[in-house]
Amino acid sequence: MIHPLLQQPSYRIIDQSSLGTMFQAEQSFATDDTLCASTQERGAVLRAWVHTDTIVLGIQDARLPHLKEGIRYLHEQGFRPVVRNSGGLAVVLDDDVLNLSLILPEKDGIQIDSGYEAMTSLIQHMFQDVTNDIVPGEVVGSYCPGSFDLSIDGKKFAGISQRRVRGGVAVQIYLSVRQSGSARAEIIRDFYDLAIQGEETKFTYPTIVPETMASLEDLLGIPLTVQDVLTRAYRVLSTVSLLQNATLTADEQTMFASQLERMWKRNEPLRDIEQQLTEE
């Protein structure tokens, strides 16, 4: 049975999965904070987003002892780093990674586990015609490990995080749809190697074993695109709610501008490092 939290009266559908390189991760995180703040009034949202060749870093990643060397490596691999405004650690985003944000009004105080369970339920129902083997639980050796990693046969293809802002909850998931999950993990492994260089750190960063990660296409043995996965999400939610295509309202656009300013500020130290690298 589908998780009761998913049974909202309606969902605004905001599809930002094909905006290309002009749409940057800072804009995504600012959008989710904006939608969290308006969801009490405007109702639930499903937002889809894709970012080309981006490494999203957690707050702890920004404190790595040799961060500059890590950033240099990411640039050499063609990736743009961004520090997110929620918990978690480094993840890889590219054109074959679909991100979904469930933005839910927190009317009765949504328990943290309930948010994770709702997203897990959505993904399980999206693929129930193909597999019943999608399970939550930390996959040791994966990047950004957490108790609500999603895996099939021990190989992780998705990770879930949450962000709470002013009466709303954003439950965010990345889904590795196609291409090599282990190749993505190698990038994060090498980033940590260069950014830590064997030094002792207060925070314990994961030891990445690339073979613990895979893509949905590889795990399910069926051809998949980002659009295929998105269609499956719409199909599931349409059985329990009314779906309406939407964009940000005028009020939300105003709020978005101030949230985006916060994200730019949060990322100023990274941009400073990038400036130093270009001057070397």
UniProtKB/Swiss-Prot annotation:
Pfam families, per the entry: LplA-B_cat
Gene Ontology BP, a term: lipoate biosynthetic process
Species in which this protein is naturally found: Exiguobacterium sp. (strain ATCC BAA-1283 / AT1b)
Function statement: Catalyzes the amidotransfer (transamidation) of the octanoyl moiety from octanoyl-GcvH to the lipoyl domain of the E2 subunit of lipoate-dependent enzymes.
Enzyme class: transferase
Record-given protein name: Octanoyl-[GcvH]:protein N-octanoyltransferase
EC number in record: 2.3.1.204
Additional detail: The reaction proceeds via a thioester-linked acyl-enzyme intermediate.
InterPro entries named in the record: aa-tRNA-synth_II/BPL/LPL, BPL_LPL_catalytic, LipL, Octanoyltrans_LipM/LipL
Gene that specifies this protein: lipL
UniProt catalytic activity: N(6)-octanoyl-L-lysyl-[glycine-cleavage complex H protein] + L-lysyl-[lipoyl-carrier protein] = N(6)-octanoyl-L-lysyl-[lipoyl-carrier protein] + L-lysyl-[glycine-cleavage complex H protein]
Keywords carried by this UniProt record: Acyltransferase, Transferase
